[in-house]
């Protein structure tokens, strides 16, 4: 069968010299050249320089009579056959669809040998007992397998794309966190440098003052000592002179002179006053607050860099009807007026509590609860297991999946198996809750003074959720990271 290149070569041979396209209704003129009837008719209608001259052939320039061109039916058939060959080539019915051995079109598929056969091949002895099917029938089950494979592959590709998207988002979040921590470190150390410069100025000013006091007291000491030396030198000179005189002159007023010398007391001057010396000795103690500030700064910075701020919000689907939530779900206030809330399975119906919108399944997280208690009010903060009891009485203890502390009017209690009242330096108004899921620590600290409040130890295997309880009209709390 003709190849695609051969068909193209044949098609070039039956092109019209005028329009360069395939000949349509080919006609022959006197010189033997062929043209499309329409092309040659339009060519003859173009007037020449001499209206009396006959038109000439576009190829060889031989004159011909306008009415002398004849239809070339044989050439028209050739053109039609070539166009059919082109169509076959375009549809892909080329050499690959023809048996190389017999030149016949391939119709069958031998399932035993997995070979494509023509009619002659099928009748051959080697395939006589084999299972034969038409090509489309044989391809059908394979197409079905391909569709199944495509479905699986597309699903796996989608899963990989989802993983890629999720991990890209996670990496972007991590990059944002790193950038935030970088800015935090820069900001904290800028404040530290400012604080250190201020403290340096204060301490240097104190040292400068002490330096001035020492120099002033030195001048006073030198002046006092010089006066004493001068007076003692005068007495010594007077006695030496008296001693050199004759006896009669020596005895004149000798008693008053001796009394005056004997009663003369030497003042023992002190170069540096005890008070100034004590100030100098106490100076290192004045730097202790600076050392404490440095220690607290480093502890605070390391803690904040070590724990991931949890950007949490309150879940209105879990809040007790007596809790009023703000529009941004960052604040809750107690009210004796019940809200019109649907009684869904997630909502607390007796304990005036609310959970955060999202839970935690790993990592180290921290958040701050700012508490404003009315007289007689209380606020409970901590974490609970995701399957904590929502209906009926809620027992606040670790055995029930609750790890929390309660801040009441005037005292703080750790809600362990048995509530324990804690002794603190001051009543916290801001409590930092820090969760280390893998280690199993729930730590509470005063967010302002960083005084430790209490730490629970547990073994977490399920999701835990930040937990908040509130009681007392006018009492409220708000969240921050």
UniProtKB/Swiss-Prot annotation:
Residue ranges annotated as coiled coil are: 150-177
Q: Where are the zinc fingers (RING-type)?
A: 16-61
Is-annotated flag, keyword Zinc?
A: yes
Q: Which Pfam families match?
A: PRY, SPRY, zf-B_box, zf-C3HC4
Zinc fingers (B box-type) at which residues? 94-135
Residues bound to Zn(2+): 99, 102, 121, 127
Per UniProt, the keywords (alphabetical) are: Coiled coil, Cytoplasm, Metal-binding, Zinc, Zinc-finger
This entry's Gene Ontology molecular function terms read: ubiquitin protein ligase activity; zinc ion binding
Stretches assigned to the B30.2/SPRY domain = 292-481
Q: For this chain's UniProt record, which GO biological process terms are given? A: erythrocyte differentiation; host-mediated suppression of symbiont invasion; innate immune response
Q: Determine the domain of life of the protein's source.
A: Eukaryota
Q: Which family does it belong to?
A: Belongs to the TRIM/RBCC family.
* Described function: E3 ligase that plays an essential role in the differentiation and survival of terminal erythroid cells. May directly bind to PTEN and promote its ubiquitination, resulting in its proteasomal degradation and activation of hypertrophic signaling. In addition, plays a role in immune response regulation by repressing the phosphorylation of STAT1 and STAT2 in the interferon/JAK/STAT signaling pathway independent of its E3 ligase activity. Mechanistically, interacts with the intracellular domain of IFNAR1 and thereby inhibits the association between TYK2 and IFNAR1.
Assembly with partners or alone? Interacts with IFNAR1; this interaction prevents association of IFNAR1 with TYK2.
Query: What is the protein name stated in its UniProt record?
Result: Tripartite motif-containing protein 10
């Amino acid at each position: 069968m003709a190849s695609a290149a051969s068909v193209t070569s044949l098609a070039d041979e039956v092109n019209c010299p005028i329009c360069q396209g395939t000949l349509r209704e080919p006609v022959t003129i006197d010189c033997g050249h062929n043209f499309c009837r329409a092309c040659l008719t339009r060519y003859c209608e173009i007037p020449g320089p001499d209206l009396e001259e006959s038109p000439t052939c576009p190829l060889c320039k031989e004159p011909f009579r306008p009415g002398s061109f004849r239809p070339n039916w044989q050439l028209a058939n050739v053109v039609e056959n070539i166009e059919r060959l082109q169509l076959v080539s375009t549809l892909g019915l080329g050499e690959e669809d023809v048996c190389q051995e017999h030149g016949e079109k391939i119709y069958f598929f031998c399932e035993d040998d997995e070979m494509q056969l023509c009619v002659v091949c099928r009748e051959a002895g080697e395939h006589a007992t084999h299972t034969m099917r038409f090509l489309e029938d044989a391809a059908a089950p394979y197409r079905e397998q391909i569709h199944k494979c495509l479905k699986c592959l597309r699903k796996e590709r989608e899963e990989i794309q989802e993983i890629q998207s999720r991990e890209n988002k996670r990496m972007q979040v991590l990059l944002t966190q790193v950038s935030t921590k970088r800015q935090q470190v820069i900001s904290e150390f800028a404040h530290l440098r400012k604080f250190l410069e201020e403290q340096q100025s204060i301490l240097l000013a104190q040292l400068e003052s002490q330096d001035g006091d020492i120099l002033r007291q030195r001048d006073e000491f030198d002046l006092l000592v010089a006066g004493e030396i001068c007076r003692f030198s005068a007495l010594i000179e007077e006695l030496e002179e008296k001693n050199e005189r004759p006896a009669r002159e020596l005895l004149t007023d000798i008693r008053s002179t001796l009394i005056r010398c004997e009663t003369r007391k030497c003042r023992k001057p002190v170069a540096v006053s005890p008070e100034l010396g004590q100030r100098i000795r106490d100076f290192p103690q004045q730097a202790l607050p600076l050392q404490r500030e440095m220690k607290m700064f480093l502890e605070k910075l390391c803690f904040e860099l070590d724990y991931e701020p949890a950007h949490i919000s309150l879940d209105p689907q879990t809040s007790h009807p007596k809790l009023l939530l703000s529009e941004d779900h960052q604040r809750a206030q107690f009210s004796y007026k019940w809200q019109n809330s649907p009684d869904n399975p997630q909502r607390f119906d007796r304990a005036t509590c609310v959970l955060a919108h999202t839970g935690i399944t790993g990592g180290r997280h921290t958040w701050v609860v700012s508490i404003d208690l009315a007289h007689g009010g209380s606020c409970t903060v901590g974490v609970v297991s995701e399957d904590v009891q929502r209906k009926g009485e809620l027992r606040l203890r670790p055995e029930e999946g609750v790890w929390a502390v309660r801040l009441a009017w005037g005292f703080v209690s750790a809600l362990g198996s048995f509530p324990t009242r804690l002794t603190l330096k001051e009543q916290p108004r801001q409590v930092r809750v820090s969760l280390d899921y893998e280690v199993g620590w729930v730590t509470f600290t005063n967010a302002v003074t960083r005084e430790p409040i209490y730490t629970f130890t547990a073994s977490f295997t399920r999701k835990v959720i930040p937990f908040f309880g509130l009681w007392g009209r006018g009492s409220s709390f708000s969240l921050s990271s």
